[in-house]
UniProtKB/Swiss-Prot annotation:
The keyword Mitochondrion does not apply. This is Astexin-1. There is a cross-link at residues 29-37 (Isoaspartyl glycine isopeptide (Gly-Asp)). Irreversibly unfolds upon heat treatment. Between 50 and 65 degrees Celsius, the protein shows an intermediate fold. At more than 65 degrees Celsius, the protein is completely unfolded. GO terms for biological process: defense response to bacterium. Keywords: Antibiotic, Antimicrobial, Isopeptide bond. This lasso peptide is probably hydrolyzed to a linear form by the isopeptidase AtxE1, in vivo. Shows weak antimicrobial activity against its phylogenetic relative Caulobacter crescentus. Does not show activity against other bacteria tested (E.coli, Vibrio sp, Burkhoderia thailandensis, and Salmonella newport).
C-alpha cells in the first residue's frame, strides 16, 4: 500500500536524477581517473577569471 505514495513522491525527483545521472555519467566518462584534478582546474580557472 505504500508503493503509490513512494512513487508519487519519488517520480519528480527521479526525472531530475536521470538528468543529473546522465550528466555525471558523461563527466565520469570524460574525467575517469582525473577527478582529483577537477577541483584544481576549477580553482585555476576562477583565479584566471578574477585577474
Amino acid at each position: 500500500m505504500h508503493t503509490p505514495i513512494i512513487s508519487e513522491t519519488v517520480q519528480p525527483k527521479t526525472a531530475g536524477l536521470i538528468v543529473l545521472g546522465k550528466a555525471s555519467a558523461e563527466t565520469r566518462g570524460l574525467s575517469q581517473g582525473v577527478e582529483p584534478d577537477i577541483g584544481q582546474t576549477y580553482f585555476e580557472e576562477s583565479r584566471i577569471n578574477q585577474d
